[in-house]
């Protein structure tokens, strides 16, 4: 996956070492990045303790929101794959006590949503 895939919304796998360094200022001491995916400018990061969603905002991307979700708080998740005429896949994550999904991410038609689902299943089950 390359630059064009990123622009089109296809998630690409990132180096865990690079993400570990980039997020060092918000990671706990000893916390380790297990897997990371990039979606345009946003990141979906799985550590050994939590899920971190990084939302880079604005034209320059300097304004950044870090959403931290402990794995124990994830009550369920769903993956809706793209169909023949529907070009988008969608990942939804619910947290304990919430009726609506706390997270909803759109993906273009590609296989990376399956990789993200596998990691999410491994850490939540």
UniProtKB/Swiss-Prot annotation:
It comes from Bacillus subtilis (strain 168). This is Uncharacterized protein YjqA. Coiled coil: none annotated. It holds the Pfam family bPH_1. SUPFAM superfamilies: PH domain-like (SSF50729).
């Amino acid at each position: 996956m390359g630059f064009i895939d990123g622009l089109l919304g296809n998630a690409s796998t990132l180096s865990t070492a690079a993400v570990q360094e980039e997020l060092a200022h918000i990671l706990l001491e000893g916390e380790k990045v297990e897997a990371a995916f990039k979606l345009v400018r946003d990141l979906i990061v799985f550590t050994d303790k939590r899920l971190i969603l990084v939302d880079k905002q604005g034209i320059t991307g300097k304004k950044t929101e870090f959403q931290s979700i402990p794995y124990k708080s994830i009550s369920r998740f769903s993956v809706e794959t793209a169909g023949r005429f529907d070009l988008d896949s969608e990942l939804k994550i619910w947290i304990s006590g919430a009726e609506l999904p706390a997270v909803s991410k759109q993906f273009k038609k590609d296989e990376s949503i399956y990789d993200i689902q596998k990691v999410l299943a491994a850490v939540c089950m």
